[in-house]
Amino acid sequence: SSKVFWIVALLCVLYYSAIFPFQKYAINMLQCNLDFTAEKAGMIFSVFPLGAAAITPLLGNFLDRKGKGASMLIYGAFLMIICHLAFALALPALKGSIAGPIVAFTSIVLLGISFSLVPAALWPSVPKLVDNRLLGSAYAVIFWIQNIGLFAFPMIIGKVLAAVNPGIEDPLQYNY
């Protein structure tokens, strides 16, 4: 059980470190890769949290009735990877194409589904993995680890962006 707890904590830090910094850069990526205005990119990306808010209660109810938490975690992580790969590889290749906005919108919808699946299954798994009297400490450790990731990953992203875009000061000129 202890080993599974640490796997859940690792999934938490990796997942949220891939989601929250991505929210910061996604609009700029849409602007750079598809020549969207900031307003259009923001409108399209707003589908992500709205979709997640709409379906998370349904997925929580499904988890309560049917279980399948591990499967939900796997599917959610897989959908996030698909979204990130689409933004990194497909969107730059589709610049100027009618398919670019379609792929972007579809990827963002998938990310919203992912952001519903993972939290709906991850947080309820913690009480199943640790003794009730240690539950507060378990959540504290997970949040502590998560915040280390949220501290480190934006700096890593910034260093990578600076390395692949030497001398470019305008983020709208970034090559993602």
Spans of features found by a protein language model:
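Extracytoplasmic gate region of multi-pass secondary transporters
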Residues: 2-52, 119, 123, 153-154
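Transmembrane alpha-helical cores of Major Facilitator Superfamily
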Residues: 13, 46-50, 78, 140-148
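Small-residue (Gly/Pro/Ala) motifs that create kinks and tight helix-helix packing interfaces
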Residues: 27, 59, 153-161
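Helix-terminus/helix-capping segments at the ends of transmembrane helices and short amphipathic helices
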Residues: 27, 31, 63, 126-131, ...
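Loop-to-transmembrane helix entry/capping segments in MFS-fold secondary transporters
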Residues: 38-39, 132-142
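Helix-to-loop junctions at the C-terminal end of transmembrane segments
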Residues: 55-68, 161
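C-terminal transmembrane helical hairpin of 12-TM major facilitator-type secondary transporters
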Residues: 69-122
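A membrane-interface helix-boundary motif in multi-pass transporters
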Residues: 159-176
